[in-house]
C-alpha cells in the first residue's frame, strides 16, 4: 500500500467528519479557536496578597448584589465592564462591583445567591482563546470534570441559582467569531445557570463594536429589570474616584509619579521579572528608515535586552509602551480647562472599596494625560453623552444630546472623522468644558495600552537584541478632515530621529517627552515587555515552510529566514523555505531588499522569495495572485508536510490567502472547493497553518 502523505490523511479525515456531521446533525463538531485583540490586560488586575478569592464572600462583605467580571486583553472589555457597573448603579440602583476574572476562584459558584446577578464581559484572544486574565476561569468552567463545592455533577445542574448576563468582544474577520463568550455561555447553560437577555456580541472587524454594545445593553437592562424587579431612575453622575489637588506636594517630590509605570521605576530601582505589569526600560541600539519614498516611513529598530533577564523566541511579540504626543496632551488639557494647572499634584482614590485606581498616584494632571490615559482613541457615543450635564452652554448641550441620541449623526460628525474626545469637543464649541470632573475622564477613558509588534529577528542569532519592523501611521481616512497619526509609531519615529542626530524631532508635526519621566528614558530608551506567541518554526529545520507576508507582515519571516540561514551555516539540514512578499514598488518599499541577498547566499536554492508589486503595472498584483501562480509548488510542499504561515492584514489579505490555499488544495486533490476550505481548517487545528494577523 502506498504511504499516505499528510494531506491524504486530512482528506480522509474531512470526508469522515463530514459523514459524522451529517448523521449526527453536527453534534460532534468542536468549535475551534479564534483570534481577537492583541495586547495586554489591565496592569492593576492581580489580586493582592491577603485579599479573599471568594467572590461570594467579597460581595457579602461589601454589600454588592451585582458583579461584572471581565476578560480583557487590550482594556476594552474592562472598559465595558466599568461602564455597565456605573450604569447599573446610577440608573437602576444596583450595588455593583467590577471584578478581574483572575482575582477569584470559582469552585463555590454553585452557591451564588439567587437574588444577585453576575455579568461576564469576555474578549476572545489568540486562537479563539481566553484573554490572559481569563484562562483559569475558562479552563475551569468549560472543563469536562468541572467540580463545585457541593459535589454536584453537571447533570445535576449545580449552577441553577446563578443568573447571569453575557457580552462578547470579537472580530468577524477571523474564522471563529466570538468563540470565548459562546463557549462560556454554553458551559454556564449546561451547568444550569439562567441567562438574562441575549448573549451580546460586538464586532471589531466590522467597526461596529461600540454600536453593537449600545444596541445590546438596552434590551438587556429591560430583561434584567423584569427579572430582578429593578426600578429605573434618572441617572446622575456619581464619581467612582475622588481626585483631590494636593498643595502639600510638588512635581519635584520623589513620591509623585510623573509617568513612571510602577513603584519600582519611581524609586529608581526597577526589578524583574518584566511583564505586562512591569516593563523594562530598554535601550534602542539602532534605528533606521526602510522606505525610500519620502512621504512614508517604515522603521527598523534594534532594542537591547542584555542583562534584563528578558528572553524571547523567534516568532514572539514585543510590547512598546507609548507616550502621548505633546499637541494632543495640550489639546486635552485646554479643552477641559486644566492647562494652567497641568503640573498640580493630584491624589486619586477609589470611593468604593472594590474600585481599582487605574493611574499611579499621586501624580499630576500633565503626567496622567501624557503617560497614563488613552486620550487619542476614537471617542464613543456613550462617553460623549455622559458630558451633557457639564456642557459650557445650552447650544453645546443640545449638540451633545443630538450626538448621543442619533447614531447616524454621531457617525457623520465624530466617527467618520476619527475624532478623539478633545477633538470632538473642539468641533462642538471653542469654549472649555471646565465643569467636567477629572474623575469622569479617568472612568471614561482607558489606560494607555502597550502596542504589540511581531519580532523581526531570530533569538538564535541575536538573543540580546530584539528587532521590530513598523510602518509609521499617518493617513487621511476617507471623510476625515484631519490626518490620523499612530500613537506609538510616531513616538518611535521621534526616537529614531533623535538617535540619528535630529536635536528637535517632530514626526508629522508631533513632539514627545522622549526623555521620559525625570529623564529616565534619556539616551534613547523605551519601556517594553515580551509576549510569547505560538507562531513558531517547526522544531525540525528540515521541514519545508511557506510564508506569506506582504508589507510589515514580513517581520516575523525575517526572523524565520535569519534563523534558518544561521542553521544552514552551522551545517544543519534546512528544508525548502518559501516567502511570498508583496509591496507597492520594488524601488520604494521593498523591505530588507539587500538583506535577502545575504540569506540567499547562505541558504542557496533552499530559499525562494516570490514577490508581488501592486503598483508597478496597471494591473495590481498581490501575494494571493502569486500564490495561485505557484499552486504546483505550494501543493508539492504541503505533501512534504510543509507548515504554512500568514502574517499581516486579517480583513483582506489573510482571508484571500486562506481562500486561495483552499482552492489550491481542492484542485490538486480533485475535490470540491468546500472540501479544500475544510482541509485548511484542519491544518489550522493541527498547527500546520498558522496566522499572526491584525485588523
Curated annotation (Swiss-Prot):
Cytoplasmic side: 32-695
Keyword field contains Endoplasmic reticulum: yes
Ranges annotated as spanning the membrane: 9-31
EC numbers, comma separated: 1.6.2.4
Catalysed reactions, as listed in the record: 2 oxidized [cytochrome P450] + NADPH = 2 reduced [cytochrome P450] + NADP(+) + H(+)
Localisation per UniProt entry: Endoplasmic reticulum membrane; Mitochondrion outer membrane; Cell membrane
Membrane topology: Single-pass membrane protein
PANTHER family the UniProt entry points to: NADPH--CYTOCHROME P450 REDUCTASE, NITRIC OXIDE SYNTHASE-RELATED
Name by which UniProt lists this protein: NADPH--cytochrome P450 reductase
Naturally occurring in which organism (per UniProt): Aspergillus fumigatus (strain ATCC MYA-4609 / CBS 101355 / FGSC A1100 / Af293) (Neosartorya fumigata)
Amino acid at each position: 500500500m502506498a504511504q499516505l502523505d499528510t494531506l491524504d490523511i486530512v482528506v480522509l479525515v474531512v470526508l469522515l467528519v463530514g459523514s459524522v456531521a451529517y448523521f449526527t446533525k453536527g453534534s460532534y463538531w468542536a468549535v475551534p479557536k479564534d483570534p481577537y485583540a492583541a495586547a495586554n490586560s489591565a496592569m492593576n488586575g492581580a489580586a493582592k496578597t491577603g485579599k479573599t478569592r471568594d467572590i461570594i464572600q467579597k460581595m457579602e462583605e461589601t454589600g454588592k448584589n451585582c458583579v461584572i467580571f471581565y476578560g480583557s486583553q487590550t482594556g476594552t472589555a474592562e472598559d465595558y465592564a466599568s461602564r455597565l457597573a456605573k450604569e447599573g448603579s446610577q440608573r437602576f440602583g444596583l450595588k455593583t462591583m467590577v471584578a478581574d476574572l483572575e482575582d477569584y476562584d470559582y469552585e463555590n459558584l454553585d452557591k451564588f445567591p439567587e437574588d444577585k446577578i453576575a455579568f461576564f464581559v469576555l474578549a476572545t484572544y489568540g486562537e479563539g482563546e481566553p484573554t490572559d486574565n481569563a484562562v483559569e476561569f475558562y479552563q475551569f468552567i468549560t472543563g469536562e470534570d468541572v467540580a463545585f463545592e457541593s459535589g454536584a455533577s453537571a447533570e445535576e445542574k449545580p449552577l441553577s441559582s446563578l443568573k447571569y448576563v453575557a457580552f462578547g468582544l470579537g472580530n468577524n474577520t477571523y474564522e471563529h467569531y466570538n468563540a470565548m463568550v459562546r463557549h462560556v455561555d454554553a458551559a454556564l447553560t449546561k451547568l444550569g445557570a439562567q441567562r438574562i437577555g441575549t448573549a451580546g456580541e460586538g464586532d471589531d472587524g466590522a467597526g461596529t463594536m461600540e454600536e453593537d454594545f449600545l444596541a445590546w445593553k438596552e434590551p438587556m437592562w429591560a430583561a434584567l429589570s423584569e427579572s430582578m424587579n429593578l426600578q429605573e431612575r434618572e441617572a446622575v453622575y456619581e464619581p467612582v474616584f475622588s481626585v483631590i489637588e494636593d498643595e502639600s506636594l510638588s512635581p519635584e517630590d520623589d513620591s509623585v509619579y510623573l509617568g513612571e509605570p510602577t513603584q519600582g521605576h519611581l524609586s529608581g530601582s526597577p526589578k524583574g521579572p518584566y511583564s505586562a505589569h512591569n516593563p523594562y526600560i530598554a535601550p534602542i541600539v539602532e534605528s533606521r528608515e526602510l522606505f525610500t519614498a519620502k512621504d512614508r516611513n517604515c522603521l527598523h529598530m534594534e532594542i537591547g535586552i542584555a542583562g534584563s533577564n528578558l528572553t524571547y523566541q523567534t516568532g514572539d511579540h514585543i510590547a512598546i509602551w507609548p507616550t502621548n504626543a505633546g499637541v494632543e496632551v495640550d489639546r486635552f488639557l485646554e479643552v477641559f480647562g486644566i492647562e494652567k494647572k497641568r503640573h498640580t499634584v493630584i491624589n486619586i482614590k477609589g470611593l468604593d472599596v472594590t474600585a481599582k485606581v487605574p493611574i499611579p498616584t499621586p501624580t499630576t494632571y500633565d503626567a496622567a494625560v501624557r503617560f497614563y490615559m488613552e486620550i487619542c482613541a476614537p471617542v464613543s457615543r456613550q462617553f460623549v453623552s455622559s458630558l451633557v450635564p457639564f456642557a459650557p452652554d445650552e447650544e453645546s448641550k443640545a449638540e451633545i444630546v443630538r450626538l448621543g441620541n442619533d447614531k447616524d449623526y454621531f457617525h457623520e460628525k465624530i466617527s467618520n472623522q476619527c475624532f478623539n474626545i478633545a477633538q470632538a469637543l473642539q468641533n462642538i464649541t471653542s469654549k472649555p468644558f471646565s465643569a467636567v470632573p477629572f474623575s469622569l475622564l479617568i472612568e471614561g477613558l482607558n489606560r494607555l495600552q502597550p502596542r504589540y509588534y511581531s519580532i523581526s529577528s531570530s533569538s538564535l542569532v541575536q538573543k540580546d537584541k530584539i528587532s521590530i519592523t513598523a510602518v509609521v501611521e499617518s493617513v487621511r481616512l476617507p471623510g476625515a478632515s484631519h490626518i490620523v497619526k499612530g500613537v506609538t509609531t510616531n513616538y518611535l519615529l521621534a526616537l529614531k530621529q533623535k538617535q540619528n542626530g535630529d536635536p528637535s524631532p517632530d514626526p508629522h508635526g508631533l513632539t514627545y517627552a522622549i526623555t521620559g519621566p525625570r529623564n529616565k528614558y534619556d539616551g534613547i530608551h523605551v519601556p517594553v515587555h515580551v509576549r510569547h506567541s505560538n507562531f513558531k518554526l517547526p522544531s525540525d529545520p528540515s521541514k519545508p515552510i511557506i510564508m506569506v507576508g506582504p508589507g510589515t507582515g514580513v517581520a516575523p519571516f525575517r526572523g524565520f529566514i535569519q534563523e534558518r540561514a544561521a542553521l544552514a551555516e552551522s551545517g544543519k539540514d534546512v528544508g525548502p523555505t518559501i516567502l511570498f512578499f508583496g509591496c507597492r514598488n520594488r524601488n520604494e518599499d521593498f523591505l530588507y531588499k539587500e538583506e535577502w541577498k545575504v540569506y540567499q547566499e547562505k541558504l542557496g536554492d533552499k530559499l525562494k522569495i516570490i514577490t508581488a508589486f501592486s503598483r508597478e503595472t496597471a494591473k495590481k498584483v498581490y501575494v494571493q495572485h502569486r500564490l495561485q501562480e505557484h499552486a504546483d509548488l505550494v501543493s508539492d510542499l504541503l505533501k512534504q508536510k510543509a507548515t504554512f504561515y500568514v502574517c499581516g492584514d486579517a480583513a483582506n489579505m489573510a482571508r484571500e490567502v486562506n481562500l486561495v490555499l483552499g482552492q489550491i488544495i481542492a484542485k490538486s486533490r480533485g475535490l470540491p472547493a468546500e472540501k479544500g476550505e475544510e482541509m485548511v481548517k484542519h491544518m489550522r487545528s493541527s498547527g500546520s497553518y498558522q496566522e499572526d494577523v491584525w485588523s
